[in-house]
Amino acid sequence: MGRLTRYELRSRFVAVHQDVYVAKGTLPNAVLRAKASWLRSRRRGVLAGFSASALHGARWIDADKPAYIIDSNRRPARGIVTWADAIDDDEICLIGGMRVTTPMRTAVDLACKFPEDTAVAAIDALARAARLKAADIALAAERHVGRKGIRRAQATIALVDPGSESPRETWLRLLVVRDGYPAPQTQYPIFNEYGALIGDADMAWPELKVALEYEGRHHTDPDQFRKDIARIDEMTDMGWILIRVTSRDGEASVLGRLRKAWALRA
């Protein structure tokens, strides 16, 4: 492939960082920002944090977030956050030729670097994408004893559950746990009397037959709407109490409805 002239470069591409370009009209996302920051590091850095998480396939990462990279550069370009943390060779993997923190190390970094709610939601998404177990993440954190923020990180990791399928499901789970309820089982399968699967409840306390579901989007498809109604009716006939939560529901409302459900089963 031939070299581009300066005119071709300026007319067809836009600079992301110095000497790093993308085609005009390209929509930024976490993966693109990660690749650009790695090139900006002259291919020497190790992508970390949300950048590593995106490369490992995690969802729900804001396209406007900066890129995160472990690099010795103390004057990063705009849109790049550099960390100077020590890292062992076995905590680095290659993705598309780029050096990236492993999923386990990424989870520990997220727990150390970000506020609890942000970190739990991010690690839930990463763990789900990379098929990590919360117990294994906790074990990985033990090798970092003495690191700044590790005690807080361990408390954060204790709240992780890969069963949460979205940040709002994480929010809902944390809300009820912090209010004193035992951690619910996530993505709990519910079967009818014939052994056929009715559906998976986002969160459930099966011994009480109480379930919580977060409705992230309204079903406009009539067929899907009818299926949802039939599923809810079947669960109700089997003795389940299903609490459906939407973005319009405040914390007090959710907890009030849950208390009533528990009182009925006490």
Where are these regions (language model features)?
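Surface segments flanking catalytic/ligand-binding clefts of nucleic-acid enzymes
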Residues: M1-T5, R43, A84, A127-A266
